[in-house]
């Protein structure tokens, strides 16, 4: 998945994200779902027959996971969910979603959340496509409103009250694929810039023959190789069953920095041509910024790693 995501993101990071997001929510079922849940929901997703989503982020709480307000109240054999979710990938195209909601408000905040499988066509759900995004426009993003949505108690994923910790586990695994998006986009910026600098003539010489140009291209190359090695190492740790979540956080953090850095230099090297739609680098420039925002902001990654160092 890491290699495929990287390669697709070299052309369009939105498409690369669609590969990452194709199983959003399934990770929760894989780690914490019952055998019945896995047999019912996962095979159709793997076959490409259904689409899932992870409905976690809310209008007033993104990185602040403990600030989510959506409620799930037990009522007989059901839970009734009410709340709003924001910036949900696959939100308008999914067949079902895993929703994070408060079930036990009297408990400490980290033990108050649970997760539920919610069919997307359930009565009380309204899904609205978010338009006008800066980048990753090939990826579906939506706001989802839940108003008295009923799901059976059998749709509880994992343990009641363990939703916060289950969500943290989800982020730990998906950060590697976000880092892979950063590799692909950054590599595309470098490749396109090298090509342009060989062809573009400035003061009678190829742009790439100037030392300042070489410095910019070389710095891009060094950062990309460092990011690739860090990300691949984190991916190998996941595949081996011994995940290094600290390394995943580092890779995700560095991916955002590297992508923004490379995209910015790519536009600079292209000059005015980098600012028009005819050239690819303007798209990569717009796409890059999201890598510092979703699946945990760059500040959140620093805070996570900093706490490890200080513990």
Where in this protein do the model-derived segments appear?
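Short Ser/Thr-interspersed hydrophobic loop/turn segments at strand-loop and sheet-helix junctions
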Residues: 5-9, 100-101, 118-123, 148-151
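A short core secondary-structure module
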Residues: 78, 82-127
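Flexible, glycine-rich active-site loops centered on histidine and acidic residues
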Residues: 26-32, 54, 66, 106
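Flexible, small-/acidic-enriched active-site or ligand-binding loops
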Residues: 67, 121-152
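A short, Trp-centered hydrophobic/proline-enriched beta-strand micro-motif
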Residues: 48-56, 100
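Short Gly/Pro-enriched turn/cap motifs at secondary-structure boundaries
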Residues: 18, 45, 60-63, 87-90, ...
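Short beta-strand-to-turn element immediately C-terminal to the catalytic PLP-Schiff-base lysine
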Residues: 31-33, 73, 99-103, 117-119, ...
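Alpha-helical interface subdomain recognition
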Residues: 1-11, 15-20, 32-37, 44-49, ...
